[in-house]
Amino acid sequence: MQHTGTVLRMMGRQRLLSKAVRSVISPRQIFSHSHLKIDVSLYVEKEAALHPNQIAFKSKLKDHFSLSQLNNISVDDIDKFMALSVNSEDLSTACEMIAAYLGDKDLHILHPKADLDLLNSYTCVCHILGNPKEAILLWNQPQVRDVIHKSSSKQLYLALIIYLDLLQKHGMYNELLEMYRFLADQRPELIRQSRKIALLVMLALYKEGTPESLSQSLLLLGQHQKNKGNQKMVISPALIAYNLGQHAKAYSILQHFGTSASSNLLIQSLEMMALSKAGKLDQALEVLREFLPRRSRRRAADGDPPAK
């Protein structure tokens, strides 16, 4: 009991762990616009920033599309319309235009690369404006799923990252996992080859928190062995196991996939809590003894007084 009290006091009765977990797992944008290769300067975010000529162009294009679909609208017109989109109504219209383009075989022959260009631009605008539901409308289109199935372009990979990051940022985990399962069935190599996709999927699996989620997370982690030490990728399945009451497994995950380079307060804290919950109090204290000198050295290097 004395050991248990020591561990729990050092862990602040799990409050420290919970706070650290929220900082890593909470809904937020995982990758910056720069990291996602989104050039924000190419898009208009607010209605007030539009020039009267741009407003007139948008209105005219909407009228053309309403009356005759794409008969009087070029691919460049669609792309320009998206760059000037500032709200969900604009995005819904843009989505309908892209769907009409994807359904026109003649336009595919005339503009063979436009499908990915339009998909990428539309997803970028949705990300900038924070409109995941409008993005889902397009990505769920059968024609877009067909593009995903057939394309090997790097542009598809980038669009996927942007889309999944948008879903993660807005807490739409079911939709993210639906896309993951589609990719696992149709394009599994994209998941195997992309650490970014795997990370976003694993964060969503953590939120799902089922035994199947744990199995899927471990499968993904095993496919990305070369990325050992990535804190978020290691911590997600460990937390799933911990929350499911599989404390010994949680500790094993941290030991097997973690490295000394990735070992930090969050990982060390979870190791101690998992061992304590599993009744291995002596091992938990060993982890604590190893961690405290390391933490003191870090504080000294930063010019802070040693921890008491």
What are these regions (language model features)?
Residues 1-308:
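A basic, Ser/Thr-enriched alpha-helical scaffold prevalent
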